[in-house]
Design a protein with these regions (language model features):
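Short, acidic, Ser/Thr-enriched surface-loop or helix-capping motifs
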Residues: 55-56, 178
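Hydrophobic beta-strand anchors of alpha/beta hydrolase catalytic cores
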Residues: 72-73, 108, 174
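Short active-site neighborhood of thiol/selenol oxidoreductases, capturing the structured segment around
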Residues: 61-91
Length: 206
């Protein structure tokens, strides 16, 4: 392995490690928030994602559905009380800012880490409240693992006495994938529509 390749791998690994540390904790009284990094992180070398196969209201969703267009990707769940609605509202504003601009308008993909409760019907209804064009997908843990592991995403479900009433801790990073389906940038919180739109224009510029 030559020095340039080694350096690129180290930089890509550092980006994923930074993104993976942004973990959001819900419903855990007295448990401190982990320190989260701030500011966008553009990938020095764009990371190709492994093959994955998820599904959603529109049918199967795989790597081929990332090809040919830019994609903002976010992991969460529909019963998330704050972070997910905030992120999706932010993405609605980002899309509004990019409408009519020379750069192509990216697709927004919401990956649910709560497949037991987030049915296709619920995902469709939930996302339509923000933007009907948003794509909702999910899968069991085995199906989620390739994509989550590649991006450094962490999530953990917390059981309760009611098997269908529980919270989920999950990473709060918004990822940007290029038209080749590679990781181009990661945006840990705090996120603002102005920064995301500006970084997208910069990265998507010819």
């Amino acid at each position: 392995m030559n020095a340039k390749v080694a350096k690129a791998l180290v930089l890509a690994g550092a980006l994923l490690a930074l993104a993976g540390t942004a973990l959001v904790w819900h419903g855990l009284p007295g448990r401190p928030l982990p320190q989260e990094p701030s500011g966008p992180s553009a990938a020095a070398t764009r990371l190709s994602l492994p093959a994955f196969a998820l599904h959603g209201p529109r049918g199967a969703f795989a790597n081929t559905d990332l090809a040919g267009r830019w994609t903002f990707l976010f992991f969460g769940y529909t019963r998330c009380p704050d972070i997910c609605p905030t992120a999706l509202s932010l993405m609605t504003e980002v899309k509004g800012r990019l409408a009519g601009a020379p750069a192509p308008v990216p697709q927004v993909v919401f990956v649910s880490v709560d497949p037991l409760r987030d049915t296709n019907a619920l995902l469709a209804e939930y996302l339509a409240a923000f933007d009907a064009s948003f794509v909702g997908v999910s899968g069991d843990d085995a199906a989620l693992a390739p994509l989550a592991k590649a991006l450094g995403v962490r999530y953990e479900r917390h059981d309760s006495r009611d098997a269908r009433n529980y919270t989920v801790d999950h990473s709060a990073v918004i990822y940007l994938l290029d038209p080749q389906g590679r990781l181009a940038a990661a945006f840990p919180p705090p996120q603002t529509p102005g920064v995301l739109a500006a970084e997208f224009r910069r990265l998507a510029a010819p």
